Amino acid sequence: MRMTTRRADSLRAQPALPQWMRMYFYGMHGVTLDILLSSARRFLDDNDFRLLGFSSPYLCIVHSITHLVLEKIYLQKRYFQERPVVFHLVFYPSLYICLQILIGNVVTCTENIRVVSITQLVVHYILALYFTSVFHKGFLSLQYQDKRVLLRSSSPNGLPGVLRFVFFGMHGLLDEVVFTSVFNLFEKADRTLSGHTSLWSFLMYGSCSFVVEKLYFHLHFKRGWGTLQRLPIYICFIYMWEFSWGFALRQYDACSWDYSHYPLNFMGLVTLLYLPGWVCLSLYQDILFNILLRVVCNDRNDKEMPNAGANGRLLPKGKLENDKLHVGFS
């Protein structure tokens, strides 16, 4: 009887991602699209293999809000069950393009309305198809486990490795945009908070954080090491990773950073001046690892999920084991 009750409890619906978490992800996703589009435009114009792209913390906030609006629009697809083509190819793209044009004019704060070219309209339409066919469908299937326990499985990861890599890569782009924007604010008094990064940073941060996460699982869960014991290993690995990537990219004139004018640098690829920043980022990474452990995918192939993204509950993730693992940040 008790086993039956446990089984029923384990199959209880998991809550959807809370709104603050969705907006956090939305901001990162929007900044990533900014970097992708601006770096592609720069590469086509200048053939610059550094793949520099631009965004700002302001735009991150704007993206969080606009993505939330787009989420609400996407959830209206239940009214188009008999006409899905109209929704995916006409209704959603039209509202998406109008919203992007409106936001573009508001952000630039110009008196004259910006003229949108045919190329920009095509890009917006392609992005709208990506949002309605891929992004919303996948993102709104994510669920958030109970904050006190995690269900034990053969691997402690809640999300597939590819999705974790993408998350870490996007977060790395956001980190660099925020850092460079704050740096420009103090050094150049740039109140626009314009920041920049490189598409290569997506691969560098994604792979680095992916490996550091494995170190966290091993050192924290298996060996019981505390934060102060893990931190030196994190820092050494981060510096080694940054140097290795920088050295490789420099061979092809694709390295987007040069610390030669900073003190305590080595070959201009790493500098101890940024040590406090790496320490803070490493501590924050442990928190992110614990949060991601609680995010899982809904494995059910339901055609419609009308409550996805709302404050209700989603369907459970298939068969779940009964063993539970307490997770904390130590």
Residue ranges, per PLM feature:
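Aromatic-rich, lipid-facing transmembrane alpha helices and their immediate juxtamembrane interface loops
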Residues: 1-330
